[in-house]
Amino acid sequence: LNPVFTVGSQLIEAILLHTDKNKKEAWARAVEMLTLVGVNEPESRLKQYPHELSGGMRQRVMIAMALACNPRLLIADEPTTALDVTIQAQILKLMNDLKKEKGTSILFITHDLGVINEMADDVAVMYCGQVVEKAPVRSIFGDNSYLHPYTEGLLYSIPRLDTPTGIRLEAIPGAVPHPLDLPKGCKFAPRCKYATDKCREMEPELNEVEPGHMVRCFYPKKGERN
């Protein structure tokens, strides 16, 4: 949100640009959308500036703005970053409800695996700008049927309540390479404990190894790895 313009002027601008509504109709639509996303006293909020709203309230305004023109696809890039756990839960519930009520598809871009597990139907894991694994979310989180070593590393690095005391988390070694100095072959090979000479020389393609499950790896089956 632009800090020098009121919430209303920014929300109405989007409606006027993308619909044939006049200013009065756009104002009414803005009030309707703020009500839909759970903002109390919507007409008063439209006259306020972003700094006068809480972080969670500003997030709701952004969602209202994104949905005001009835899009078929909502792209949510880190929608819960910097929000406390309570507000995060409210925002996720709101987006889930809107998805069901409006039939809007949501593309989540996030590093929060908990959000993915809760919200997604399908998940695409990316590394160095490439999709390295794509599968139904239940395969990754529910059945532990993940196949790519990077996905494995992400999941192993999450603290678990049932982990015995004294067991250290299995962090992924190394660091993500600079985008202007990417390694030859598989981009994850320098950090992969299963990498072979083939991985370091050749770049794997994204292949479907099971129905609905794609992976970019020469050794997608765990039994094939050293």
Sequence positions of predicted segments:
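ABC-type ATPase nucleotide-binding domains, specifically the catalytic core motifs of the NBD
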Residues: 5-25, 35, 39-40, 135
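Conserved ABC ATPase "signature" region
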Residues: 24-44, 152-156
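Conserved ABC ATPase signature
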Residues: 48-53, 57
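P-loop NTP-binding/switch modules centered on Walker-like glycine-rich loops
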Residues: 75, 79, 83, 87-167
